[in-house]
Amino acid sequence: MRVILAPMQGVLDPFVRQLLTQVNQYDLCVSEFVRVVDQLLPTKVFYRLCPELYQQGLTASGTPVRVQLLGQHPQWLAENAQRAIELGSHGIDLNCGCPSKTVNGSNGGASLLKQPELIYHATKALRAAVPKALPVSVKVRLGWDNSEQAFEIADAVQQGGATEITIHGRTKMDGYRADRINWAKINDVRQRLSIPVIANGEIWDWQSGQACLAETGCQDLMIGRGALNIPNLSQVVKFNQAKMPWAEVLILLHQYAHTENQFDTGFYHVARIKQWLGYLKKAYPQADALFQLIKTCHDGQALRMKIDGVMN
């Protein structure tokens, strides 16, 4: 079984990837999306969103990273895919699942679910641009507002030549509502395809991971929000290990707090720590207490002083 760390825009930035891969055995990470419009992007854009490209596309602990592209113009997706591959990406992933209103408003992400033919052409262009030895993957949801087109969407991906497909078990309109997860539909789609299907959605622990594998019939899982709730989730899902003790979570947060300038992700660092604590408190009651302690911090120095105090 492979366990893949999902792309989460504005959340799983390069340094969080580094932290999580150093305490897990992820088989692959997918980067935050590189937005492609109507031009070949400069190399600095790829390096900013995926600095692992400086290290042969690997995190510090050796986990391969695959660049994800977002856009709706097959030609420009293909040209930017070639650039990402030249820089060292371990294949290319196409984003057809992001539910963000901003992204969808510019005809990217999940908006492509309404246009299976465009998904086909984009996938085909990527497959032609990427060397055959390297994978082209596509991440989708079950549909826009219902799952009636799920088969058509998946067929478009397969007919376009993708190596594998990741299916999030909800529609775009379902958002992240737990009661809307539909693993059974992933299984229906999987049985129709000959390419590998990676299941995604509502995987929080060993039990839900096993349930997802059983109901979808998939052999591989992609985890996103759960990886932030329990920082060693791949170990939990793969090996039924216990969740990481809070003391070890604190060490990760301490590392994060002291690397404010290591990567330029374009996001406000203090807010990112607070955001991560929002995820952590679902599994660790201590995270809420720490959030209350730092919630008035507005700069990195104040944040570090607070966290250093807790560590000591």
Curated annotation (Swiss-Prot):
Residues annotated to bind FMN: 7-9, 68, 139, 200-202, 224-225
Protein origin, superkingdom: Bacteria
SUPFAM superfamilies xref list: FMN-linked oxidoreductases (SSF51395)
Reaction equations catalysed: 5,6-dihydrouridine(16) in tRNA + NADP(+) = uridine(16) in tRNA + NADPH + H(+); 5,6-dihydrouridine(16) in tRNA + NAD(+) = uridine(16) in tRNA + NADH + H(+)
Pfam family, one: Dus
Keywords: Flavoprotein, FMN, NADP, Oxidoreductase, RNA-binding, tRNA processing, tRNA-binding
Signal sequence residues: none
Enzyme nomenclature, EC number: 1.3.1.-
Active site residues according to the UniProt entry: 98 (proton donor)
Site (Interacts with tRNA) residue list: 35, 95, 176, 272, 274, 279, 295
Molecular-function annotations in GO: flavin adenine dinucleotide binding; FMN binding; tRNA binding; tRNA-dihydrouridine16 synthase activity
KW tRNA processing (keyword) present: yes
NCBIfam families listed in its UniProt record: PRK10550.1
Biological function: Catalyzes the synthesis of 5,6-dihydrouridine (D), a modified base found in the D-loop of most tRNAs, via the reduction of the C5-C6 double bond in target uridines. Specifically modifies U16 in tRNAs.
Family indicated by similarity: Belongs to the Dus family. DusC subfamily.
Protein name as it appears in the record: tRNA-dihydrouridine(16) synthase
Organism: Pasteurella multocida (strain Pm70)
